[in-house]
From Swiss-Prot:
Membrane topology, record value: Multi-pass membrane protein
EC numbers on record: 3.6.1.27
Organism of provenance: Brucella suis (strain ATCC 23445 / NCTC 10510)
NCBIfam families for the chain: PRK00281.1-2, undec_PP_bacA
First and last residue of the signal peptide: none
Family: Belongs to the UppP family.
Protein name, as recorded: Undecaprenyl-diphosphatase
InterPro entries: UppP
Keyword annotations: Antibiotic resistance, Cell inner membrane, Cell membrane, Cell shape, Cell wall biogenesis/degradation, Hydrolase, Membrane, Peptidoglycan synthesis, Transmembrane, Transmembrane helix
Gene that encodes the chain: uppP
GO CC annotation terms, alphabetical: plasma membrane
Domain of life: Bacteria
A Pfam family that the UniProt record links to this protein: BacA
Function: Catalyzes the dephosphorylation of undecaprenyl diphosphate (UPP). Confers resistance to bacitracin.
GO molecular function: undecaprenyl-diphosphatase activity
Length: 268
């Protein structure tokens, strides 16, 4: 039993790390896996801490860039504007997420069919956007104007619906607002840092009375898998989307969403 629990923890950590930064909805995948496979033994502490593994993955890959930003911040106006832009983009999710946290977790997260619908809708949107003949105006995340950042931030709030995808909403929003594919994915990475850290801190605070570290081995295994797989995705995603776009992720969403919907209709 312990061995299978460790496999479960490794699998869930792997899914979290692989899907957190690509536009397929990590939350949607984890909810469907939990519903169909009954993976519930890991508990709230596990859920919170594998998110931390994904957060540390992106921070480790971007550590050199973050250090350079911190060094340039006092003397470079462009760097200060970029940091302000990321914070501006983060604000809508911070405010709306805090206000609607109970509804999101208590209602939306209990609806597997909604997850499947959102996966399918998001898949069609990704395929549509990937085929558009867009003429990007912004090729560097440092050059995003503040109004564009704010608009991306509001679009990110759609990801509070499970199955939408935080990275998917920000990437599609960035593309439609004039960014090229590489910078759209990279801005999604930067925006993930405060958004995921804020969500992690808020979940940790809300769950402080029920957290338990009794299953320490499961938590460690899930955390490590989320970290390793997250590092892999962050290191390779920008080059991939620059060459191939987002069609693969669109098709993946359609397959998973359709299969999940069929399974719900047949087995419930």
């Amino acid at each position: 039993m312990v061995f299978f629990n460790l496999l479960e923890a490794a699998f869930l950590g792997l899914i979290e790390g692989l899907t957190e930064f690509i536009p397929v909805s990590s939350t949607g995948h984890l909810l469907l896996i939990g519903h169909f496979l009954g993976f519930e033994s890991t508990g709230k502490t596990f859920e919170v801490l594998i998110q931390l593994g994904a957060i540390l993955a992106i921070l480790s890959v971007y550590s050199a860039k973050l250090a350079r930003i911190a060094t340039d911040f006092p003397r470079d106006a462009r760097t200060r504007r970029f940091v302000l832009g990321v914070l501006v983009a983060f604000l809508p999710a911070a405010v709306i997420g805090a206000l609607a946290h109970g509804f999101i977790k208590g209602v939306l997260f209990e609806t597997p069919m909604l997850v499947c619908i959102m996966l399918i809708v998001g898949g069609f949107i990704l395929l549509w956007v990937d085929q558009l003949n867009l003429r990007p105006r912004y090729h560097n995340v440092m050059d995003y104007p503040l109004p564009i950042c704010l608009a991306i931030g509001f679009i990110q709030c759609l990801a509070m619906i499970p199955g939408v995808s935080r990275s998917g909403s920000t990437i599609v929003g960035s593309l439609l607002l004039g960014a090229d594919k590489r910078s759209a994915a990279e801005f999604s990475f930067f925006l993930a840092m405060p958004t995921m850290a804020g969500a992690f801190a808020y979940d940790l605070f809300k769950s402080r009375n029920i957290l338990s570290f009794n299953d320490g081995a499961l938590i460690v295994v899930g955390f490590i898998m989320a970290f390793i797989s997250g590092v892999f995705v962050v290191r390779h995603l920008l080059d991939y989307v620059s060459r191939h776009g987002f069609a693969l992720f669109g098709w993946w969403r359609l397959i998973v969403g359709s299969a999940g919907m069929a399974a719900l209709i047949i087995w419930g």
